[in-house]
Amino acid sequence: MKYLASFRTTLKASRYMFRALALVLWLLIAFSSVFYIVNALHQRESEIRQEFNLSSDQAQRFIQRTSDVMKELKYIAENRLSAENGVLSPRGRETQADVPAFEPLFADSDCSAMSNTWRGSLESLAWFMRYWRDNFSAAYDLNRVFLIGSDNLCMANFGLRDMPVERDTALKALHERINKYRNAPQDDSGSNLYWISEGPRPGVGYFYALTPVYLANRLQALLGVEQTIRMENFFLPGTLPMGVTILDENGHTLISLTGPESKIKGDPRWMQERSWFGYTEGFRELVLKKNLPPSSLSIVYSVPVDKVLERIRMLILNAILLNVLAGAALFTLARMYERRIFIPAESDALRLEEHEQFNRKIVASAPVGICILRTADGVNILSNELAHTYLNMLTHEDRQRLTQIICGQQVNFVDVLTSNNTNLQISFVHSRYRNENVAICVLVDVSSRVKMEESLQEMAQAAEQASQSKSMFLATVSHELRTPLYGIIGNLDLLQTKELPKGVDRLVTAMNNSSSLLLKIISDILDFSKIESEQLKIEPREFSPREVMNHITANYLPLVVRKQLGLYCFIEPDVPVALNGDPMRLQQVISNLLSNAIKFTDTGCIVLHVRADGDYLSIRVRDTGVGIPAKEVVRLFDPFFQVGTGVQRNFQGTGLGLAICEKLISMMDGDISVDSEPGMGSQFTVRIPLYGAQYPQKKGVEGLSGKRCWLAVRNASLCQFLETSLQRSGIVVTTYEGQEPTPEDVLITDEVVSKKWQGRAVVTFCRRHIGIPLEKAPGEWVHSVAAPHELPALLARIYLIEMESDDPANALPSTDKAVSDNDDMMILVVDDHPINRRLLADQLGSLGYQCKTANDGVDALNVLSKNHIDIVLSDVNMPNMDGYRLTQRIRQLGLTLPVIGVTANALAEEKQRCLESGMDSCLSKPVTLDVIKQTLTLYAERVRKSRDS
């Protein structure tokens, strides 16, 4: 099988790409910060440049104004010159003008010639200059005006202000400029000349402008002006600490107002540029260089770089801090994302890959075939070796059918018989694999299972046949055993009703006991067989648990008295008066437990305690017998198990009684438990659910309230039960210790009273008393310990109180025996067995009934046609015409007389079949005289009522 490509490499690459993404994000933030800072820097540079330009405009205006003054003065000077003599002709002079001061500029300068030759002109010009000074010089801020002759090289100084002049410095500067001017090319000699000399303090100097004066196209003189220049006037008011420097055409500093650390020198980068803005070498200063036309001078404004960055320094720090924090955050986020996403994902991928490989190895080594088929065409995409082998075993038709089933998606499995007779079961589920609709198929070789199912089916058929044979065996055995046994028990029962010679009655009793034991053994075996074959059914109906317990104790009390034991029956007041269940099976279970208790108890007593336990009715049977070892308690309810090898083996039994009890209680939705200790006795507890329980009204006997009863009872359990029962009836209960009673008091005791009781009566509970309470002498009553719950009824009789009870089980039975008067009833006995037919006739005769007999169903119909019959008592299984067909024929004839079936069949369906055929009831053989009496009394009363109506 091919393994899927690992995607751990993809996850690792994704992890590194995530790191790269974090780095790119950080770089993006950094570039954004740099861009923002650069933009802020450019904005700051733009502001500084704008301020530089505004300041340079002031310097430009200063130069331009001086140039304009030069033009005006030149115009004045040229217009004042006389074209004839080359001197100025004063016009309208009112006073004598002062002669200007003359200064030689060179060693060969002839100031006397200039003074003599141009005296008149200079005086006229001086007068005009004085006039111009008085009216205009203040506006132009001029210090002096001077005129230099072109031939004599002597300077005539027209001072406009009284300002000290450094003569040597000024003459030296003029000397240098005159030489430069004289040596300049012909084209440049006609232009103006500008220069600045340093002043008395930094930032203050003298600005000189020199222009040629021509007369008749001939250079006659050079006119110049001197003006004080203050660099501080070239700044705009503001907070920017800028420096300013004026350079000549060679880049030499003429005047500067800067700090000592910033000395501006001409930079070749911007010397030839009219305007240049940028940083100096080393990025120490930001400068703006602009020419100052019409002069050849240029002005340079500068500001230190740290001043430029001062306003954005905090922005830079914030940007650096932001980038550091962003980098740390991105790195932390990347690391956290790796630890929480990528690294676990890589671990999961590794585990998933290992799991995938492990699953594939499991699939490859699986004992079944596993494959993936494409849904569209059934092509095998992936499979293990076993599936490949199985698929090759399929025929072409099988593959087509499998493909159709997969495409249809109607079923999830299909059984296929291969060409070599191998049974394959193919189950599948639909899924997606590699972007295709597929079916995951599992192929299992079920040949062994098919063979096993066939074998099991054969075994089931054999078991069903065996069950049918077992049912037939039960029916046959039940009929064949119960039929002769009924003849034995029934005749012995009849024989005991006769007067027998002395000694014969003992033999008859022994025979009756033995036959009863045989009947019990046979009944247990048949019941167990019916339970095992699920033939036994629970028949729920409403019954009184109190009556069932009274009936059980009445049946076993003679046996208990015979063994000189005590049988205490405590029925608590909370026991319901009626509930839904099977009273016959409950009686069978309790009778079995009580019989075992009597059997295994030689001394002491047996206690039957009935009470309500929540939603259950609890029935406890406790004895003081030999007990059961703990190791054998766990097997106590196993079939055919008998306890021990010692004294218990001395008791007869099949070992089926408790097993049957456990099965019956389980069928009634109850449970049974045992608690035993060797030498101390055993206690069996049966619990059945209280279905449809009806409880008595909680009220005492009217008339007994306030009566006093004295208790002198040695048995603690009996004493406690009597005290509770009497107090519930409103009786005052007092322990008797020899006190003097009142005439209305009653003494209740379980021992012989030594002296005469002075009260109303004495009730003695005796273990050997059987039957209803008996008055041996006036005021002296004997009561059975098996029915202490009947004591309130006896007290009502003693106090002559008429008792009304909603529970007849607590009432005292009538002492008068009913006289049998049944000779008005004609009963037809139908049985093919002559002994049983004769026995039934004798039993009916002993009960006072009139009787006719018939051999089978045909004979019975003949008798019915000729005689009046009130009740039909018929066997079920007979030749010619059985009891079922006889009943159906009777109903077809329109006869409504009661038909009672008698059968020896032990199956549960037998009674149901009898009822379905039309019978009113069904009795199981052997039928005792008491059962016949109870049944016929019921139906005879019904017939009499029908006659009367």
Swiss-Prot record:
Processing and modification events after translation: Autophosphorylated. Activation probably requires a transfer of a phosphate group from a His in the transmitter domain to an Asp in the receiver domain.
Residue ranges annotated for the ABL domain, each copy included: 705-805
GO molecular function, one term: phosphoprotein phosphatase activity
Location of the PAS domain: 357-425
Annotated effect of mutating H479Q: Does not induce cps operon expression. Retains phosphatase activity
Regulation of activity: The Rcs phosphorelay may be activated by RcsF. DjlA, LolA and OmpG might act as a regulator of the phosphorelay. Activity is probably up-regulated by YmgA/AriR, and possibly down-regulated by YcgZ, all 3 are connector proteins providing additional signal input into signaling system.
Keyword Cell inner membrane assigned: yes
Gene Ontology terms: cellular component: cytosol; outer membrane-bounded periplasmic space; plasma membrane
Alphabetic keyword roster: ATP-binding, Capsule biogenesis/degradation, Cell inner membrane, Cell membrane, Kinase, Membrane, Nucleotide-binding, Phosphoprotein, Transferase, Transmembrane, Transmembrane helix, Two-component regulatory system
Localization: Cell inner membrane
Transmembrane segments: 20-41, 314-335
Superkingdom of source: Bacteria
Periplasmic topology ranges: 42-313
Top EC class, one word: transferase
Domain Response regulatory as annotated: residue spans: 826-940
Family: Belongs to the RcsC family.
PANTHER family: HYBRID SIGNAL TRANSDUCTION HISTIDINE KINASE J
Subunit structure comment from the entry: Interacts with RcsD.
Other remarks in the entry: There is a close linkage between the Rcs and PhoQ/P signaling systems, and both signaling systems respond to certain external divalent cations (zinc and magnesium).
Protein name as annotated: Sensor histidine kinase RcsC
Organism: Escherichia coli (strain K12)
